Amino acid sequence: MGLITTLKRWFNMIFKKQAEEDFNIQAAEFPEMESLINRCANIYRGVPEWLDDKNNIKTINFAKSVCSETARLATLAIGIQIDGSARATWLQEQIDKVYFQIRHWVEYGCAYGTVFIKPNGESLDVFTPADVMIVDYDNQEIKGIIFKDSYTVGRKYYTRLEYHRFVETTMDGVTTYPYYVSNRAYVSKSPQSIGDEIDLKQTKWADLMADTPPILKANGEKLDGPLYGVLRTPQANNVDISAPLGLPIFAEAIEELKDLDIAYSRNAKEILDSKRIVLADDRLLMPSGSPVSAMTPQAMEHRCSEMSLPDYVKNVFGQDEKEFYQEINPILNTDTRISGINALLSQLGYKIGFSNGYFVFNETSGIQTATGVEAEQQRTIQFIKDVRDKLESCLDQVIYALSVHADLYGLAPVGAYEINYDFGDITYSYETDKQTWLSYVNTGRVPFWYYLVKFEGFSEEDAKTLADEANKENKASGLFGDE
């Protein structure tokens, strides 16, 4: 792990130096954030610094679980509808292509604190902080950034640096802020080196411009935003307030993650060591009159095998007159340990943004039914809403970037578009919903056939036929009489 981390750090230094030389810029530095993000990235990948083979400390990689659960809830039944023109239809096609990647983007955003989503000409790419270099920013708004992209062909390693920035320009007393994109390509024989600069035409990025002309709106005004989207976590950055980067969602709970791994490892080791043992005298295993020479450890092991004894039976050589026999059945502290684990899970979940009791070991999670969930899970609901708001903002930026990209490369007709988002209810319970609609039927608010179609899988025709029959049979008792 140490060697890999060192190599990555070394390559990032080369990447930074090359970018600064070729684009004549000075990269912004956030050493504290870089250290924290690298630490959290290792935890998310399942290689935290507290792993210890000697003391049997392993990891259950709960950081991955909380990031995955957050992404699952945030993107639950997400709908993205873009309407209004032929441009809108094209944008909808681009989003549909990556629909099932959106959950992954949110998970990476939770793990790294920030991810960047950028059009690549054919689809959308996701970049973590390790793959970008921030050049210029104002508060939380990034004004200049360099993206690093790469691919391999045989033993050749190709890298592309893509520099995005707004440039303040004043002509004849009028100040404008055109947007520029510059691309530089490199080839190397080693993955640890960026190599020598080559022409874009010699790479798979041949369709990209080395330097775009100034990009402005048709009326000469500044673009509404950059040609990429930024997904940040909702919580404030208390590590480096000035940095335009978000915190990994578990950054405040690293100590709890460590304690959880230790608690789990101790419990698992105790279970592993809890095997029943029977200590049996050699005289109980060997027939009377057996020569002493036959009572070697190897002979006793062979004898146990012949007798088909369980492997937990261990031979001991008795020295007393009476044969020795003892059973050892270790007592597990599982209940006590699980209580401690649950306390850690509750504290960990709360610090991340979930309600107390959302994560529970060996028990039902708190968000299984809609009954009472509005009151019990308000913290979880608000946290997921915050993540969804950040996701909406990022997707707005991405769709705008796609639209500008379409203008630059003539990919779709010019036209207005409108975006509508729809998210699933994280408190939804199918059984509760079913009972609610059945009560609507019983009170005459909706027809019985509609319930059959919605919940029982009937076609509308069959459902209406069945409902009519039920209405006739139960008319005397008043059931379905109002239909």
Give names to the regions the model predicted.
Residues 74-78, 322-328, 375-378, 473:
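Short glycine/proline-rich turn/loop motifs
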Residues 116-247:
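Extended, regular secondary-structure scaffolds
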Residues 14, 66, 70, 74-77, ...:
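Generic structural signal for hydrophobic core residues of well-folded globular domains
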Residues 98-112, 117, 267-275, 333-430, ...:
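C-terminal amphipathic alpha-helical
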Residues 36-37, 43-44, 337, 357-361, ...:
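Extended hydrophobic-aromatic, low-complexity segments
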Residues 209-375, 426:
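Extended, charged amphipathic alpha-helical segments
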